[in-house]
From Swiss-Prot:
Name under which the protein is recorded: WD repeat-containing protein 91
Biased composition (Polar residues): 284-300, 345-354
Lineage: Eukaryota, Metazoa, Chordata, Craniata, Vertebrata
One MF term in the entry's GO annotations: phosphatidylinositol 3-kinase inhibitor activity
UniProt organism field: Mus musculus (Mouse)
Residue ranges with Low complexity bias: 266-279
Length: 748
């Protein structure tokens, strides 16, 4: 507690200095110096009591103890009153013993003179009045214990412990609880970091085990593939006689089959030696290598003879030109056997064989043939290739959980998390507003249905219990999510009834409101406008600044070259800058201190759908009707830093098709992209869920990092809350479903 008090004093002192309350600061310093409670430091309180005894200041000692009783001890229950009385008695006895030990009998007599009225009726003091008159009180059996060092130390320790327990148990103001909360927060963060490291370690271990298992499977498959028939695996060390003997012992059916030779069925024709072709061979498709021909002819001849060793030897007793020629031929055959065996183990043999058998088959038709005739080696090669492609860098995020909020029954227009990251406000096309929390459990806090159509939604920044709701009839409502009622409703403009966008300043003092005239076409029109054509929002509009407290209009911004509908607005972190995206494709940057447009530039061919500041606020990102995601440098008007093309399901208009030709089209209303806390990753919409891209690569292209998925209808708006330790991604779709995905950032 003492540390918390000391730190709070420093914070209060810093705050007073920041506010310029110098007189109050001087008064605070003076009172801290004269603080009798010593900042709730037990050691200093005990030291103060001992110092008063050492200077024989009995009056100050009595006053200080009375102050402690009045300020601290009075808060205790009555059961502790005997303990307090015993400590007070021991304190005065400690003072008396000290006066006798220092030969100040006059101070001892003074003590009894001043305290006689209070002590004479107390039984525990009856024997102590003679203490100043005893020649050797330290040897007296009644007082000897109190003159020992052990008793003095025991008293000091008892007093110290009593005060310590008292300070720990006494109620403290709310401002002092922050220290304990900070410690708990730090402890939780440390535990989270330990668990995070354990999680990553387990993932790495799982990845390693899977890799080892895959390698073992590959090795096992390779061993199975390389295990050749005995008569093939022993070719390199067989002599001619043994080869003839083996061939003669094989069944005659093998020699008569079109797939007569094991080598012949796998080796490509291009690999065979023309000099070893037998003139008595059959059709070209049945030809094999010269050695294979020898096997077949010898086996056919052996069919009419009696099998045995003699027959085998007689087959080799044919005419030979000479001993040297026979040796040379034998060596050539052995070399060819080794060559054929090596070719057998290559993966290209089966593919060439398949191409040889069906040369007329097209590429699309040849693929089934390849799959039919390929051996385990080719399959293994494909698996290995797929495995190597799968060895990508570790994902930047780990999906901890994905929950669904399903209390909407029509397409979502807006879905926003409040500043604290604890609650979500969602709005659908039927005018249903839901305010719900997701931590620790998903629970609806407030629900409301608007009679008039709603087009925009924004959380108030300072009082995060309030919602700003813009309608399609020219009004803005202030809704209290805790009281579950409308606090006020203001008319913006009757001529421009559509409130397309709302943005509340971070300081909470004001908000901007974009009002536009009725659209040129209906939202329910099934045909999306062509890129670059005159869009549905190419109508006049106004950008207004309103005071949040008084709910009165402060000013109207100038929109050059002509008033146009503003689709999207966003403030920077301190509210000094406002960026807007309009239906004419122009981005305008407003100086909120001067209340004027600082710069503007043509950004998109068509409407600007969504615009946001970068995390460092040196750039602005935008998504437009032309399906482009562009980064702009705000220090140089119109300077394009990077540009990327997005799929149509990320930019809209969003289309949901149904049975019998039913088609629902929704133009973008809410945020189309959101950033993580560091601005390195971006969440966008897609047809099946949110997509996370990596920003800021050297090639200045978007890199698809993670697909959140989970949706059956197109996602129309997203949000990314980083208020908690884990990031929370919100993706809302046209079927009324909102997916809440909790991500854990992988810290490298």
């Amino acid at each position: 507690m003492a540390e918390a008090v000391e730190r709070t004093d420093e914070l209060v002192r810093e705050y007073l200095l920041f506010r310029g309350f110098t007189h109050t600061l001087r008064q605070l310093d003076a009172e801290i110096k004269a603080d009798k409670e010593k900042g709730f430091r037990v050691d200093k309180i005990v030291d103060q009591l001992q110092q008063l005894m050492q200077v024989y200041d009995l009056a100050a000692l009595r006053d200080y103890w009375s102050y402690l009783e009045r300020r601290l001890f009075s808060r205790l229950e009555d059961i502790y009153r005997p303990t307090i009385n015993k400590l007070k008695t021991s304190l005065f006895r400690f003072y008396l013993v000290y006066t006798i030990q220092t030969n100040r009998n006059d101070k001892a007599q003074e003590f009894f003179a001043k305290q006689a009225t209070e002590l004479q009726n107390q039984a525990e003091w009856k024997d102590w009045f003679v203490l100043p008159f005893l020649p050797s009180p330290d040897t007296n059996p009644t007082f000897a214990t109190y003159f020992s060092r052990q008793w003095a130390d025991t008293f000091i320790i008892s007093l110290h412990n009593f005060l310590s327990v008292l300070f720990q148990c006494m109620p403290v103001p709310v401002i002092l609880n922050f220290d304990a909360e900070c410690q708990r927060t730090n402890q939780v963060q440390e535990e989270n970091e330990v668990l995070r490291q354990k999680l990553f370690a387990l993932q790495a271990e799982i990845h390693r085990l899977k890799k080892e298992e895959q390698q073992q499977e590959e090795e096992a498959a390779a061993l199975v593939q390389h295990k050749l028939p005995p008569y093939v695996s022993s070719m390199d060390r067989l002599g001619d006689s043994e080869l003839a003997l083996v061939c003669s012992q094989r069944p005659a059916s093998l020699s008569q089959s079109p797939r007569v030779g094991f080598l012949s069925s796998l080796l490509p024709q291009s690999k065979k030696s023309p000099s070893r072709l037998s003139p008595a061979q059959g059709p070209p498709q049945a030809q094999s290598s010269a050695k294979k021909d020898s096997f077949s002819s010898q086996a056919t001849k052996g069919k009419d003879s009696v099998p045995g060793a003699k027959d085998g030897k007689s087959l080799l007793s044919g005419p030979v030109p000479g001993e040297a020629s026979w040796t040379h031929q034998r060596q050539r055959r052995l070399q060819d056997h080794g060559k054929e065996r090596r070719e057998l183990l290559s993966t290209s043999s089966s593919q060439s064989q398949c191409a040889e058998r069906k040369p007329e088959v097209s590429g699309a038709e040849a693929e089934p043939c390849l799959e039919l005739h390929m051996g385990p080696v080719e399959v293994l090669a494909r698996v290995s290739t797929a495995g190597s492609e799968g060895d990508r860098p570790e994902q930047p995020f780990i999906v901890l959980s994905q929950e669904e909020y399903g209390e909407h029954h029509s397409s979502i227009m807006h879905c926003r998390v409040d500043c604290s990251g604890r609650r979500v406000a969602s709005l659908d096309v039927d005018g249903v507003i839901k305010v719900w929390s997701f931590n620790p459990i998903m629970q609806t806090k407030a629900s409301s249905i608007s009679k008039s159509p709603l087009l925009s939604l924004e959380w108030a920044t300072k009082r995060d219990r309030l919602l700003l709701l813009g309608s399609g009839v020219g009004t803005v409502r202030l809704y209290d999510t805790e009281a579950k009622k409308n606090l006020c409703e203001i008319n913006i403009n009757d001529d421009m009834p559509r409130i397309l966008s709302l943005a509340c300043s971070p300081n909470g003092a004001s908000f901007v409101c974009s009002a536009a005239a009725p659209s040129l076409t209906s939202q329910t029109d099934s045909s999306a406008p062509d890129i670059g054509s005159k869009g549905m929002n190419q109508v006049p509009g106004k950008l207004l600044l309103w005071d949040t407290k008084t709910m009165k209009q402060q000013l109207q911004f100038s929109l050059d070259p002509e008033p146009i509908a503003i689709n999207c607005t966003a403030f920077n972190h301190n509210g000094n800058l406002l960026v807007t995206g309009a239906a004419d494709g122009v981005i305008r940057l407003f100086d909120m201190q001067q209340h004027e447009c600082a710069m503007s530039w043509k950004a998109h061919c068509g409407e600007v759908y969504s615009v946001e500041f970068s995390c460092d606020e040196n750039a602005v990102y935008s998504i437009g009707e032309d399906r482009k995601f562009i980064q702009w440098n705000i220090h140089k008007s119109g300077l394009k830093v990077s540009e990327s093309n997005l799929p149509s399901d990320a930019t809209g208009p969003f289309v949901l098709s149904g049975y019998s030709g039913y088609k629902q089209v929704q133009v973008p209303r809410g945020r189309l992209f959101a950033f993580d806390s560091e601005g390195n990753y971006m969440l966008t919409c897609s047809a099946t869920g949110g997509l996370i891209y990596k920003l800021g690569s050297e090639e200045k292209v978007l890199e698809n990092c993670l697909s959140l998925g989970g949706h059956r209808a197109p996602v129309v708006t997203v949000d990314w809350s980083t208020a908690m330790d884990c990031g929370t991604c919100l993706t809302a779709s046209m079927d009324g479903k909102i997916k809440l995905t909790t991500l854990l950032a992988h810290k490298l």
